[in-house]
Amino acid sequence: MRSPSAAWLLGAAILLAASLSCSGTIQGTNRSSKGRSLIGKVDGTSHVTGKGVTVETVFSVDEFSASVLTGKLTTVFLPIVYTIVFVVGLPSNGMALWVFLFRTKKKHPAVIYMANLALADLLSVIWFPLKIAYHIHGNNWIYGEALCNVLIGFFYGNMYCSILFMTCLSVQRYWVIVNPMGHSRKKANIAIGISLAIWLLILLVTIPLYVVKQTIFIPALNITTCHDVLPEQLLVGDMFNYFLSLAIGVFLFPAFLTASAYVLMIRMLRSSAMDENSEKKRKRAIKLIVTVLAMYLICFTPSNLLLVVHYFLIKSQGQSHVYALYIVALCLSTLNSCIDPFVYYFVSHDFRDHAKNALLCRSVRTVKQMQVSLTSKKHSRKSSSYSSSSTTVKTSY
């Protein structure tokens, strides 16, 4: 199985490169300085705007934060990873969504969940050029407050959307094994209802990201950051409670459901008698389990754990020593947009066929003609075999 292994290798390479970048950043700063997180401290100085001299609330950052904002970790490494995710994720998820919507006739629950997962990835990836440009230009945001809020909202919304839809997909696969004779139309209606509920939930839980002011001007660096620097009071108060609630409610609980579903699935597969066809299904189910667990370990677990640790250190100590690892983990979480199409490949046999036909530029009409031709050939072989056996029987008497 290549996709999980490739994901592990890519994740390991990214972590190695990130650790080197982080060490270089830390060595270039004063180790005795405090406030090792991107906390914006109020600096009540006046600055000249286009309409004259006005006094506004501006912010300053400590030496470590300045080194992170100007270092290669954020200005070189992050845009490289985001570029890879954009180049791979945009066409693969676009094709996946097209296959699910226009090529797949039977809308099973798994197809519905995977289509929503592809849509979530696509809605996140299309904003990546702005994020890439932001980091390349020294973490300087020039696109306005509204676009910054949209970018951050879609960034976190995609991560938690992916977690919830992967959980639904995992539970659904277990339910198919336990109850294979269920009514497909009823299941599809339930899946549509659950998908709509997930989108509504994500919209509601990401509202604070759209409301809170995400851009802050740093006069000392002459840059405007997008989400990288926030006021200290906001970080230790509302943002801590907000991200802690997200980590528990939208990551930890779904992760528990996913793990439970796969443990029960493995038990069911081991206890049931296996013929040749069932053995193939069992192997495909195991591939799905390994792929999903790899996604959780590489993409979701580090970012959510470090997110809680980062904000806890800010709240308890007024500083965070893990910010560099935290932003690398957030960067790794975007790899799910590249891995998800491989999950579709393992889960759905129809998706594999439709994707191959799409890549070979075969129209729906051409595929139907090929299927009819193949069916007629099989039927003719069976007929010739039957007539041959009948002739043999007659001559033996």
From Swiss-Prot:
Gene3D superfamilies: Rhodopsin 7-helix transmembrane proteins (1.20.1070.10). One of its GO terms (biological process) is cell-cell junction maintenance. Activated upon interaction by mucunain, a cowhage (Mucuna pruriens) plant cysteine proteinase. Residues 1-25 form the signal peptide. The chain crosses the membrane at residues 72-101, 109-137, 150-177, 184-211, 236-269, 278-317, 324-347. It is found in: Cell membrane. Residues 26-36 form a propeptide. Changing residue 135 to Y: Slight reduction in ligand-mediated receptor activation. The keyword Nucleotidyltransferase does not apply. InterPro entries: GPCR_Rhodpsn (IPR000276), GPCR_Rhodpsn_7TM (IPR017452), Pro_rcpt_2 (IPR002281), Protea_act_rcpt (IPR003912). A proteolytic cleavage generates a new N-terminus that functions as a tethered ligand. Activating serine proteases include trypsin, mast cell tryptase, coagulation factors VII and Xa, myeloblastin/PRTN3 and membrane-type serine protease 1/ST14. Subsequent cleavage by serine proteases, including neutrophil elastase and cathepsin G, leads to receptor deactivation. At least in part, implicated proteases are also shown to activate the receptor; the glycosylation status of the receptor is thought to contribute to the difference. CDD domains: 7tmA_PAR2 (cd15370). Widely expressed in tissues with especially high levels in pancreas, liver, kidney, small intestine, and colon. Moderate expression is detected in many organs, but none in brain or skeletal muscle. Expressed in endothelial cells. It is a multi-pass membrane protein. Residues 102-108, 178-183, 270-277, 348-397 are cytoplasmic. Belongs to the G-protein coupled receptor 1 family. Receptor for trypsin and trypsin-like enzymes coupled to G proteins. Its function is mediated through the activation of several signaling pathways including phospholipase C (PLC), intracellular calcium, mitogen-activated protein kinase (MAPK), I-kappaB kinase/NF-kappaB and Rho. Can also be transactivated by cleaved F2R/PAR1. Involved in modulation of inflammatory responses and regulation of innate and adaptive immunity, and acts as a sensor for proteolytic enzymes generated during infection. Generally is promoting inflammation. This is Proteinase-activated receptor 2. It comes from Homo sapiens. The gene is F2RL1.
